[in-house]
Swiss-Prot record:
This is Innexin inx1. In ovary, expressed in follicle cells. Expressed around the periphery of the embryo during cellular blastoderm formation. Repeating epidermal pattern emerges from stage 11, high levels of expression detected along the borders of each segment from stage 13. At stage 13, expressed in the dorsal branch of the tracheal system. During stage 15, detected in a few cells at each of the branch points of the dorsal trunk and at low levels in cardioblasts. In embryos, also expressed in the salivary gland and the hindgut (at protein level). At stage 17, expressed in the dorsal side of the CNS. The chain crosses the membrane at residues 29-49, 111-131, 178-198, 268-288. Heterooligomer of Inx2 and ogre. Keywords: Cell junction, Cell membrane, Gap junction, Ion channel, Ion transport, Membrane, Transmembrane, Transmembrane helix, Transport. It comes from Drosophila melanogaster. PROSITE patterns: PANNEXIN. One of its GO terms (molecular function) is gap junction channel activity. Coiled coil: none annotated. Its main location: membrane. PANTHER family: INNEXIN, INNEXIN INX1. Residues 1-28, 132-177, 289-362 are cytoplasmic.
Amino acid sequence: MYKLLGSLKSYLKWQDIQTDNAVFRLHNSFTTVLLLTCSLIITATQYVGQPISCIVNGVPPHVVNTFCWIHSTFTMPDAFRRQVGREVAHPGVANDFGDEDAKKYYTYYQWVCFVLFFQAMACYTPKFLWNKFEGGLMRMIVMGLNITICTREEKEAKRDALLDYLIKHVKRHKLYAIRYWACEFLCCINIIVQMYLMNRFFDGEFLSYGTNIMKLSDVPQEQRVDPMVYVFPRVTKCTFHKYGPSGSLQKHDSLCILPLNIVNEKTYVFIWFWFWILLVLLIGLIVFRGCIIFMPKFRPRLLNASNRMIPMEICRSLSRKLDIGDWWLIYMLGRNLDPVIYKDVMSEFAKQVEPSKHDRAK
């Protein structure tokens, strides 16, 4: 278990060459590791421990445990509003009086570990696609200029090679930028779709799960319906049928304890809060990208903010002469180059790059 969790550390290592931003990494790396960790913990609890334990007379316990785990257990929703110890033995546990429509069945618990695993894979997909699209371009053109451990002659040679690449490949990076922004947009779509599917998975209880917990946090336990216990009940019921000695059908009503749901309820509280935080960050990021794309006057200020050593005149000149793809490339270069080298390269690049058609028309 510890070895499996330790192997996830590699996904959180600092990147010496950055081709994305912090929010993108939070979605692709941190959330992937978070979901995989939750999946491993629940898997260990489910298959190493005892996920269900049922009380019943006249039937071997392991038979009932296996049956109720494979099929499903249920509660009576109206019993959650009754006082425990007086009206009901446990929250949601009461006589069903043969009313099948009044029962709330729980079938999700055996699938939680698999669902979390596939959620993790879905969160990693944008990073996988971007790595394929990017193809190591940034690392190739940086050529180690992000570190200072090289001779002066070597620095100058690499700087000239970088400048030569930028001049020869003007107007060839629009697809590079579009693919990255598409991957960022995919992150936002992924979170929205996952939240919708989780809400369906938990019968419409996920989207309001965290807010219900916060609303009732100050209400005494005996005066409220605990949302965590309602969505992840710790004690449920299960009906087991078998044939008696004479062939008559016998019904056995069992009380089942689900210790796994204690882990599930805490896991999904954290996931609920994290997904909402991540969704807000991703929406803000998309709005920010929209400002970059549709507000050209915003680009010089952003370029200058990334490296204060570059004069605003040079930032304006580059933003005016370059299309959005080339501008994005030099903006990302600022995160990967030594600031002094970056200033020299951008100053020389601004002198040598030809103005765009729009700029010449002016």
